[in-house]
């Protein structure tokens, strides 16, 4: 967990399918706006992560590239290590490898992969993370990643089991701040009090590693003042009680002018330790103004 006043990093996860030319344009635009990381999601119907990352590297000069995040049970760990190491070679060491346990049952069924219990999927993630660490630590391993220890591991999660795995293996821990309802309903946001409790639990798990691990928060939306009323109408019934009348305080939303949003992010870095902030593609442009203020 990086120091509360650590330097910000900003990422954007690109979700919309695109032609080659459009993909190149979007990646270059992200770099122009000041983003540090371009992320590629791992859902059926979207571009395959590793080819998309390699093209993103060819189209840009400095941004790092991440899977944000893989459905880890889709992948054999040894073959995933080869994919990640090759991508790291071909991007000159710009890859970060994001891992998640997977949560969309329909995608598993479509792919013909058993949708195991949550506990089993977390075990699969833990085994994969340990295998990646072991292989990349072997000086004889080929293909050799450019980064000496291999691509940094980003592990996403919120629950106790996933955070225990992340505390053991991750260089970056990504927290969602919101999750889809199990019945397919609107996002269920997490308030400040619940986030405080998660951070306390995570600090305990990390122990001496706390200052070395970077914390990421995924912002579900960046909402300018003129869209506040519509956003409240959409999200209001599903907000936690401690911020029901103050949605600006939700860790997974940004609401206000660019200056107000910048201040909110500084406050969250101070309170929770979130120094790495990711937005979805739909928020890429408005977030650019906030990034400029925080450089």
Language-model segments: residues:
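Active-site-adjacent structural elements that line small-molecule/cofactor binding pockets in enzymes
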Residues: 1-295
């Amino acid at each position: 967990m990086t120091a509360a006043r650590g330097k910000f990093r900003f990422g954007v996860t690109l979700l919309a399918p695109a032609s080659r030319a459009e993909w190149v344009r979007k990646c270059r635009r992200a770099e122009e706006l000041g983003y540090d990381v371009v992320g590629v999601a791992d859902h059926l119907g979207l571009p395959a992560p590793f080819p998309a990352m390699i093209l993103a590297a060819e189209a840009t000069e400095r941004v790092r590239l991440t899977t944000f995040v893989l459905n880890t049970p889709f992948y054999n760990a040894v073959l995933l290590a080869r994919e990640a190491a090759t991508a790291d070679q071909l991007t000159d060491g710009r890859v970060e490898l994001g891992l998640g346990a997977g949560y969309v049952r329909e995608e598993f069924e479509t792919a013909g992969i058993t949708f195991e219990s949550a506990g089993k999927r977390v075990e699969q993630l833990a085994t994969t993370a340990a295998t990646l660490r072991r292989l990349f630590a072997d000086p004889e391993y080929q293909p050799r990643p450019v980064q000496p220890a291999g691509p940094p591991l980003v592990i996403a999660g919120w629950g106790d089991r996933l955070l225990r795995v992340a505390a053991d293996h991750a260089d970056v821990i990504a927290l969602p701040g919101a999750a889809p309802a199990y019945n397919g309903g609107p996002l269920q946001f997490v308030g400040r009090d619940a986030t405080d409790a998660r951070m306390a639990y995570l600090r305990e798990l990390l122990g001496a590693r706390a200052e070395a691990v970077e914390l990421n928060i995924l912002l579900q939306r960046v909402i300018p003042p003129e869209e506040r009323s519509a956003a409240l109408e959409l999200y209001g019934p599903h907000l936690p009680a401690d911020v029901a009348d103050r949605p600006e305080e939700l860790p997974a939303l940004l609401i206000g002018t660019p200056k107000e949003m910048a201040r909110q992010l500084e406050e969250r870095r101070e309170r929770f330790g979130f120094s790495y902030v990711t937005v979805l593609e739909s928020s890429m442009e408005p977030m650019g103004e906030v990034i400029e203020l925080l450089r």
